[in-house]
Amino acid sequence: MNLLGLLLILLGIILGVVVGYIVARNLLHQKQLQAGQTAEDIIEQGNKEAENIKKEKLLEAKEENQIIKEQSEIELRERRGDLQKQEARLLQKEENLERKSDLLDKKDEILEQKESKLEERQQQVDAKESSVQTLINKHEQELERISGLTQAEAAQEQLQRVEDELSQDIAILVKEKEREAKEAVDKNAKELLATTVQRLAAEHTSESTVSVVNLPNDEMKGRIIGREGRNIRTLETLTGIDLIIDDTPEAVILSGFDPIRREIARTALVNLVSDGRIHPGRIEDMVDKARKEVDDIIRDAGEQATFEINVHNMHPDLVKILGRLQYRTSYGQNVLKHSIEVAHLSGMLAAELGEDITLAKRAGLLHDVGKAIDHEVEGSHVEIGVELAKKYAENETVINAIHSHHGDVEPTSIISILVAAADALSAARPGARKETLENYIRRLERLETLSESYEGVEKAFAIQAGREIRVIVSPDTIDDLKSHRLARDIKSQIEDELQYPGHIKVTVVRETRAIEYAK
């Protein structure tokens, strides 16, 4: 770096001399031309200037060289200090490694000593195990000789004994847990159903197979009969309803098992009596008019039912079929009102369980829709209802609810189960349905006779209006297990042989009494 600086300085001097010479020459030439200055003066002046430049450059080079020298010395001192520090750190690491090496050597010695001791102990343990195994084998042979059983046979016998004991304990535990679970489920179900039923207050009107038309006077009976009975025959032929004209004052009785035809006949007869003109031609007109009026009533009844339940987007033809249930009864219970009640109950139950309330109401409303035309189409009302629901593109959940509410198929959703429960609630509620007294008495007698036909039954009592049969059994003949079997057998026979609305509870009572007399 110093040599390069010197070269640069010399080069600068040379360039300066050359430049000075050129400048001097030019000046000299100019002075010669302008002022006539001599060449010696110009050369002397150029030499002086060159000498000054040379001195300045030499001075600058010396100063720069001194600065470079001082910086080099400083860097050298710093590097020497860094090397000394690194050397000290290396010495410290070396000392640490030596100490760690000493510690590892000591640990190796300790581990070798421990391994030696462990080997000695292992040898002692092996010797003891061998001795113990010998004693065990000796004792096993002695036990096998005394008991006459091999080790495997003895183990199997012990396992069988333990299994028998555990099986009994498990059976008791399972029975107890089943009882607790049933009690909990029954309690929750009863609370849910009780809450739901209390929220619904439905009105029911008992229906019959006859209708009565009041007349303004008894002379009207003759006009209804007509000459040679042609008027009454025409009316009966057109409506399919029997007209009973007897000694009942100012009244005509219409008898028929089709409520819609009976309503058409009643409406036509009321209109004929009001009009006063009664002859075959007029009867035909009035019957046609009555049919239209009843159709309107049916349609209005269906629309009113869907409006009350808040069910929308139902096919108009299905709404009309639903309205026909207004004139359909089951055990004296109006089926349309029953369907509305089931819809309300289904919606309430669905709300309690977090299910779709609207869908539950729709399924409840349509569950008995097949009864509207079951006297016109072959098949049970369930099968007819399923076909109607499919025909009018109802939801699969609704179809399954219709199909499963009497147990014909398995329910595939919670809503189907809720509809079946709501149907049973509506039908079994006291006062919802009625039977004739004769059928009622006959059914109760048959229920008691069936229960008393089993061996060990002392007496059977039909209670709760025939919704429960209480069977008293002999404790000497029937034990606890047989009591459960007897209840199931009676239940199965009732289901196979008897027809009844709702459910019948079978209760078997087994009572043991210990009696002693103090003398």
UniProtKB/Swiss-Prot annotation:
Alphabetized GO MF terms: RNA binding; RNA endonuclease activity
Limits of the HD domain: 335-428
One Gene Ontology biological process: mRNA catabolic process
Gene Ontology cellular component annotations, sorted alphabetically: plasma membrane
Localization per record: Cell membrane
Residue span, KH domain: 209-269
Positions of transmembrane segments: 3-23
Enzyme class: hydrolase
Keywords: Cell membrane, Endonuclease, Hydrolase, Membrane, Nuclease, RNA-binding, Transmembrane, Transmembrane helix
InterPro entries documented for this protein: HD/PDEase_dom, HD_domain, HDIG_dom, KH_dom, KH_dom_type_1, KH_dom_type_1_sf, Ribonuclease_Y, RNase_Y_N
EC number(s) per entry: 3.1.-.-
UniProt xrefs under Pfam families: HD (PF01966), KH_1 (PF00013), RNase_Y_N (PF12072)
Domain of life from the UniProt record: Bacteria
Membrane topology: Single-pass membrane protein
Annotated function: Endoribonuclease that initiates mRNA decay.
NCBIfam families registered for this protein in UniProt: HDIG, RNase_Y
Family: Belongs to the RNase Y family.
Protein name per UniProt: Ribonuclease Y
Organism: Staphylococcus saprophyticus subsp. saprophyticus (strain ATCC 15305 / DSM 20229 / NCIMB 8711 / NCTC 7292 / S-41)
Upper taxonomic lineage: Bacteria, Bacillati, Bacillota, Bacilli, Bacillales
